């Protein structure tokens, strides 16, 4: 929802040469009222006063320029024109906000998640791992076939799958150990830095104490 200050600015037609502000300037000029002085007073009343207080406040401002028989009608005209312009502007603002939200939702719906780009280095590393798995499994298969050809044929699929899973698990475990090692090393470094700061602090304090004692001894000698 648009803020009150934004609505008021739109009602006045700031920046576009139109709106209530231009109409009020023309009306005040026709009534012989100094718009440069009283425009701000009138707008302040319209923007800040309660609805039932607007007429009384406007009559107090314009009574010095207008006859009593026309004063109330002109004040009503100003209040009604303000209300009409404000209502239209508020409606347009709401429609603009709804359109903006609709457009945003449509754009979000059109967003397509881009697939992760696999680098050439990753491709080569993956191919090397697959080739390594293939070589090891082929050697194991040959040994199994020599020992028990029937059992080898029956279990070949599960053995390969198990080997792959085991190797993947080994890789993951190795990475975890590496992360843990780095974290432990970082913690040790922090503790060492903390101890070093404490040592530096104590050494500084000791130097101050020694300097203080030397100063005191010098004063006693004098």
Curated annotation (Swiss-Prot):
Transmembrane segments: none annotated. Residues 152-168 have a biased composition (Polar residues). The modification Phosphothreonine is found at residue 137. There is a cross-link at residue 93 (Glycyl lysine isopeptide (Lys-Gly) (interchain with G-Cter in SUMO1)). Residues 136-145 have a biased composition (Acidic residues). The keyword Phosphoprotein applies. InterPro entries: CCDC43. Residues 210-222 have a biased composition (Basic residues). Keywords: Coiled coil, Isopeptide bond, Phosphoprotein, Ubl conjugation. Residues 135-222 are annotated as: Disordered. Residues 119-148, 175-217 form a coiled coil. Residues 172-209 have a biased composition (Basic and acidic residues). The keyword Ligase does not apply. Belongs to the CCDC43 family. PANTHER family: COILED-COIL DOMAIN-CONTAINING PROTEIN 43 (PTHR31684:SF2). This is Coiled-coil domain-containing protein 43. It comes from Rattus norvegicus (Rat).
């Amino acid at each position: 929802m648009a803020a009150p200050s934004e609505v008021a600015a739109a009602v006045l037609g700031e920046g576009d040469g139109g709106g209530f502000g231009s109409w009020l300037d023309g009306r005040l000029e026709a009534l012989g009222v100094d718009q440069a002085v009283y425009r701000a007073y009138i707008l302040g009343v319209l923007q800040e006063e309660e609805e039932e207080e607007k007429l009384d406040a406007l009559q107090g401002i314009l009574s010095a320029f207008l006859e009593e028989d026309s004063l109330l009608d002109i004040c009503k005209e100003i209040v009604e024109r303000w209300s009409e312009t404000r209502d239209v502007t508020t409606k347009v603002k709401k429609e603009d906000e709804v359109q903006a939200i609709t457009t945003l939702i449509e754009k979000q719906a059109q967003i397509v998640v881009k697939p992760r780009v696999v680098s050439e280095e990753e491709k080569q590393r993956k191919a090397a791992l697959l080739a390594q798995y293939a070589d090891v499994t082929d050697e194991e298969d040959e040994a199994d076939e020599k020992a028990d050809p029937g059992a080898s044929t029956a279990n070949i699929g599960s053995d390969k799958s198990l080997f792959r899973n085991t190797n993947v698990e080994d890789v993951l475990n190795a990475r975890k150990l590496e992360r843990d090692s780095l974290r432990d090393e970082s913690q040790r470094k922090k503790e060492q830095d903390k101890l070093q700061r404490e040592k530096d602090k104590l050494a500084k304090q000791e130097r101050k104490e020694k300097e203080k004692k030397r100063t005191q001894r010098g004063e006693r000698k004098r």
